[in-house]
């Protein structure tokens, strides 16, 4: 599918072109991706941005774990250290009992159901007792019960009837409404130990009370007990990556966080180890760029150390701190990981940058498909766009019938045990680079007498010594110009441990007349085989070529037919000493390599394989 594109070149020209098939493949291990993420973190201020106030709540509502456990009970007003009731209030029943008891001071329950006031010596049956404080006796129930009409005087040491049973019965010491019963002096609601009492739930020292400040439901057991949390130090994380075949990567960042804060009982110094884990999917956006996208992010806390009151009572707030940090750190650190991955995505996007190829053209890499993720490596397929400064794309192979299929990218060799990255460049791509140079005329050269000291004199006398008819036509020595042109694109053939460049050139021998008129003596076709070697300097692939052999064919001659073989040594020397240095000079600008994930190929091992050049680091 042809997709039009147009980008501005760094030179004055613009480069417009079309997408090609995959010509370059990059494989990287998890270590390369991990190093890229680590380098991004070190160079950016993403983690330093976390050194700030920790947002404990939003709109006054603290982070909590109420979705796990039930919310704390609601009290009447909650003003008195978490107590159930207002200041000075206790819970009573239908009378003004003391400390929550059901009956008045000094009253006991007799066996016949009547209430006896031990503060007085006279007794009255329940049916004649005045109700609610008007007499010494009153009924223990709403309806009158059958009672005694007469009660005798007690002998010395005698226990009144009903006292023993009343101690354990309703209203007794331990019975219902008694001192220790559910509604009595100690255990009843509002009693000493009961709910809302001194030690009861919501009481002065109970849950939510003074001691409840440090307990479940108290002030310190909620986030309100810790305020002013601020991250003061965040170490650069240790990054580890695990490849998830067909998905992406599993990212783990281990860091240490130092946090300061305040509590009701002193300042807090918190040190916590955090392991941030994220499942990251590798996708492609609509523009065709790969993107690392977080699917899930979690934080695992460990090694929490809390210094409170110079070491006092640290265990009381450990669970609270753990719960608070478990709630707030994911919302604080996971977005930072997302920012870091965004910067890594930007690095992936740098591949698409237009890079000058000398002053004559440019190279641009683009992604051709969704990267492949295996258990061993991440594979990126790249297109290469080689453009001329004049605006045309080099669509290799030029001059070939359109029905011929393009050469497919060969299979890459397995990665070695000590290999972290592998860049494979096809012969097709190298041919495109040389084709761009050929179309710009960079390989054409005019060689004149005296230009190269190692060459013999380029005159009619030198040529006439080999071709007598030249001497006959030009008895006086005249200077010659050897005009070498490359009319067709060179081709690159890669074989095992051998890179061959075939260049077809024409060599026109021109003589200069006294009146500056040039006359062609002959035109020779020269087929040359060049041996190429490769190296890496910086971020560029350097190509150096040397002449292997030449083959000549006489196309035209103005001095009659002659055996072109007699010129083979001279032509080969001209190509070796003049043409090859000129060609290596234009190749000296190097071929830009893809800039991706901070990979350094400067010390790469280079292997020439069948139709493939492989750089391994």
Curated annotation (Swiss-Prot):
Keyword Disulfide bond recorded: yes
Domain of life: Eukaryota
Database matches in SUPFAM superfamilies: Bactericidal permeability-increasing protein, BPI
Record keywords: Cytoplasm, Disulfide bond, Glycoprotein, Secreted, Signal
Gene3D superfamilies linked to this entry: Bactericidal permeability-increasing protein, domain 1, Bactericidal permeability-increasing protein, domain 2
GO CC list: cytoplasm; extracellular region
Signal sequence segment: 1-17
Cell location: Secreted; Cytoplasm
Region entry Disordered, spans: 117-142
Main location class: secreted
InterPro entries linked to this entry: Bactericidal_perm-incr_a/b_dom, BPI_fold-BPI/LBP, Lipid-bd_serum_glycop_C, Lipid-bd_serum_glycop_N
Listed GO MF terms: lipid binding
General function of this protein: May have the capacity to recognize and bind specific classes of odorants. May act as a carrier molecule, transporting odorants across the mucus layer to access receptor sites. May serve as a primary defense mechanism by recognizing and removing potentially harmful odorants or pathogenic microorganisms from the mucosa or clearing excess odorant from mucus to enable new odorant stimuli to be received.
Family stated for the protein in its record: Belongs to the BPI/LBP/Plunc superfamily. BPI/LBP family.
Name the UniProt record assigns to this protein: BPI fold-containing family B member 4
Species in which this protein is naturally found: Mus musculus (Mouse)
Name of the encoding gene: Bpifb4
């Amino acid at each position: 599918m042809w997709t039009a594109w147009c980008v501005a070149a760094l030179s004055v020209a613009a480069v417009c072109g079309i997408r090609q098939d995959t010509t370059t493949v990059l494989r990287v291990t998890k270590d390369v991706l991990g190093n890229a993420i680590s380098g991004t973190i070190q160079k950016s201020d993403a983690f330093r941005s976390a050194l700030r106030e920790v947002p404990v709540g939003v709109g006054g509502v603290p982070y909590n774990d109420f979705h796990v456990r039930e919310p704390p009970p609601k009290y009447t007003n909650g003003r008195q250290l978490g107590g159930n009731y207002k200041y000075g209030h206790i819970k009573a029943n239908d009378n003004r009992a003391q400390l929550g008891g059901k009956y008045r001071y000094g009253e006991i329950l007799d066996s016949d159901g009547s209430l006896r006031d031990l503060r007085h010596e006279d007794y009255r049956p329940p049916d004649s007792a005045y109700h609610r404080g008007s007499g010494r006796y009153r009924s223990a129930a709403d309806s009158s019960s059958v009672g005694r009409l007469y009660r005798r005087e007690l002998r010395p040491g005698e226990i009144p009837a009903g006292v023993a049973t009343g101690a354990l019965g309703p209203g007794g010491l331990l019975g219902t409404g008694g001192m220790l019963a559910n509604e009595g002096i100690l255990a009843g609601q509002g009693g000493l130990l009961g709910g809302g009492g001194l030690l009861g739930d919501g009481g002065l020292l109970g849950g939510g009370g003074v001691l409840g400040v440090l307990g479940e439901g108290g002030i310190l057991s909620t986030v309100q007990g810790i305020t002013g949390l601020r991250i003061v130090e965040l170490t650069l994380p240790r990054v580890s990556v695990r490849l998830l075949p067909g998905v992406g990567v599993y990212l783990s960042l281990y860091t240490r966080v130092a946090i300061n804060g305040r509590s009701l009982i002193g300042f807090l110094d918190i040190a916590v180890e955090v392991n941030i884990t994220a499942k990251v999917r590798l996708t492609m956006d609509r523009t065709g760029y790969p993107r690392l996208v977080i699917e899930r992010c979690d934080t695992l806390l460990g090694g929490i150390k809390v210094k409170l009151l110079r070491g006092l009572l640290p265990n009381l707030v450990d669970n609270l701190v753990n719960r608070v940090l478990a709630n707030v750190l994911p919302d604080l650190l996971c977005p930072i990981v997302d920012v870091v991955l965004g910067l890594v995505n930007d690095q992936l996007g740098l591949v698409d940058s237009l890079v000058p190829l000398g002053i004559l053209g440019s190279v641009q890499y683009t992604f051709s498909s969704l990267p492949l993720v295996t258990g061993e490596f991440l594979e990126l397929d790249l297109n290469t766009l080689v453009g001329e400064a004049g605006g045309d794309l080099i669509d290799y192979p030029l001059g070939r019938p359109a029905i011929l299929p393009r050469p497919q990218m060969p299979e890459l060799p397995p990665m070695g045990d000590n290999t972290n990255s592998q860049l494979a460049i096809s012969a097709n791509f190298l041919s495109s680079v040389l084709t761009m140079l050929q179309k710009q005329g960079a390989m054409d050269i005019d060689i004149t007498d005296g230009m190269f000291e190692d060459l013999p004199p380029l005159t009619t006398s030198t040529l006439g010594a080999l071709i007598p008819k030249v001497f006959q036509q030009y008895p006086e020595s005249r200077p010659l110009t050897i005009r070498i042109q490359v009319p067709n694109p060179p081709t690159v053939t890669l074989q095992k441990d051998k890179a061959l460049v075939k260049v077809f050139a024409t060599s026109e021998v021109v003589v200069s007349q006294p009146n500056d008129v040039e006359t062609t003596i002959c035109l020779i076709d020269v087929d040359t085989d060049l041996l190429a070697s490769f190296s890496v300097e910086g971020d560029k692939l350097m190509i150096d070529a040397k002449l292997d052999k030449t083959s000549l064919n006489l196309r035209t001659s103005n001095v009659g037919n002659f055996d072109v073989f007699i010129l083979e040594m001279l032509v080969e020397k001209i190509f070796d000493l003049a043409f090859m240095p000129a060609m290596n000079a234009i190749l000296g600008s190097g071929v830009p390599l893809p800039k991706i994930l901070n990979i350094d190929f400067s010390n790469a091992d280079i292997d020439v394989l069948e139709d493939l050049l492989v750089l391994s680091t």
